[in-house]
C-alpha cells in the first residue's frame, strides 16, 4: 500500500507537501486522501461500443483480466493493461475517461428523428465524436483542433472506429 511506500522515504517528507494549500479546501474534502491520490494510478476506463458489450467482456474473462463494471457501457481495468492486445480498440471499445462518458447521458436524451450536425470543436482524440456517432447514429460530423498532428491521429482512430463521413479542419478557437 501507498502508506508503506511513503514510510520508505526520508522522514521529513509528508504527503501533504504535495499540495500545500489544504487550508483552501471546501469543507468535506479529505486533505490526506487528496494528496495521496497523486501517487495512485487511476483506472483505465473503456466505453463499450454498441453491440460489443458481451464480446469485450468475454475476451477479458478468457484472459482472466480483472475488471469492474461501472455501468452497461463502461468498465474499468488496470491502467497497466495492454488493452489493444486483447480487444479491437476503437472498434469494440474506446478508451475514454469516465467523466467524458457522462456526455453520453445528455446525447441519449436527444430524439434520433433528424440528422444532427455535430461539431467537436476541440476534438483531440475524438472520443466524444465517436460517442456521438454511437448514440445519435446518423450525424453530420465536423471535427477541429488547433493541432494538425492531432487531426492526423484522429483520422486513424476514426478509420478503426468505422467512421468514414466527416469534415475536419485546423482551428484555434481561443
Language-model regions: role of each:
Residues 1-174:
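S-adenosylmethionine
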Amino acid at each position: 500500500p501507498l502508506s508503506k511506500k511513503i514510510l520508505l522515504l526520508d522522514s521529513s517528507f509528508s504527503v501533504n507537501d504535495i499540495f500545500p494549500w489544504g487550508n483552501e479546501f471546501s469543507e468535506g474534502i479529505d486533505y490526506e486522501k487528496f494528496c495521496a491520490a497523486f501517487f495512485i494510478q487511476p483506472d483505465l476506463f473503456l466505453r463499450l461500443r454498441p453491440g460489443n458489450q458481451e464480446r469485450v467482456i468475454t475476451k477479458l474473462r478468457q484472459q482472466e483480466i480483472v475488471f469492474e463494471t461501472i455501468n452497461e457501457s463502461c468498465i474499468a481495468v488496470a491502467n497497466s493493461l495492454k488493452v489493444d492486445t486483447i480487444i479491437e480498440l476503437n472498434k469494440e471499445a474506446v478508451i475514454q475517461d469516465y467523466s467524458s462518458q457522462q456526455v453520453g447521458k445528455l446525447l441519449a436524451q436527444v430524439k434520433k428523428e433528424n440528422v444532427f450536425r455535430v461539431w467537436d470543436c476541440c476534438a483531440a482524440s475524438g472520443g466524444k465524436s465517436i460517442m456521438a456517432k454511437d448514440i445519435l447514429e446518423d450525424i453530420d460530423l465536423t471535427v477541429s483542433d488547433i493541432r494538425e498532428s492531432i487531426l492526423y491521429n484522429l483520422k486513424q482512430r476514426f478509420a478503426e472506429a468505422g467512421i468514414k463521413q466527416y469534415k475536419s479542419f485546423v482551428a484555434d478557437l481561443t
